[in-house]
Amino acid sequence: ECGLNYEDNTFRYRQDSTFLYYFGPKRDGLVGVIDVDNDKELLIGNDIDIDDIVWYGSVDSVHDMAEHAGVKESAPMKQLQVICDNAMKEKRTIHFLPPYRHDTMIQIFDLLGIHPSKQREAASVELIKAVVKMRSTKEQQEIEEIERACAIGYKMHTTAMRVTKPGVTEKYVGGQVNGIANSYGAMVSFPTIFSQHGEIMHGNPSMAVLESGRLALCDCGGETMEHYCSDNTRTFPVNGKFTQRQLEIYSIVEDCHDLALKISKPGVKYFDVHMDVCRLMTDRLKELGLMMGDTE
């Protein structure tokens, strides 16, 4: 956890997705070790003390969390340094994924002596590829969880469309959208983007008042209790009706979306789908006089 404005008032903690995939526990202060050479896994972390129990209540021990995840061994955090030291003495390769949290970077520096500025380039490409290969194939339970996330996202977007009207603020709509995610016991996949300024890539909701004749862009998604996410973007008129020009441009986006669905299939490269969509979009924008030149 990380302090928001002082140590005990923290940002909401969200467990790392790859850690969740392989080990499961959502609590902070844990490290997962996969020892391929010795064919064993360990869940490492310290049990919470009485001060934490007063605030959060009784929670599972690290041993119990490991057992629940099917991990046979657990150890306190101090053991992690011993494991790393022994591996380095034996000249074994220690693989880790690119860190993105500063406390993790400091921990890697303490354990392995790799400066935070060098850690991304020192991260294991072999491990990255192995994780990507495994996580790219979804089992049925995962597919159901993704569909659950999409259903939450659908409710978020339709709520945005319903409450958007001239005179309300972007903040109001954004708050209503976020409330949908929270009400399903979930959270937003990322900070909700809702703005009349669609040209700004990450336009967070402001106190700007929505105006008739403008377009509102909503980019949001929900994250389930099991941390699978949805992410959709929709653009719609503030007053509920497109102008002719807006409709012409919007229809291009709709046709590009339909083309992507039509040509996407096993064996087709994502890049090829992307380029075919770009060609269609460019040709249609040229027809409207909004682009010029050779499509290719």
Model segments located where?
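Active-site neighborhoods and metal-handling regions in enzymes and metal-associated proteins
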Residues: 1-296
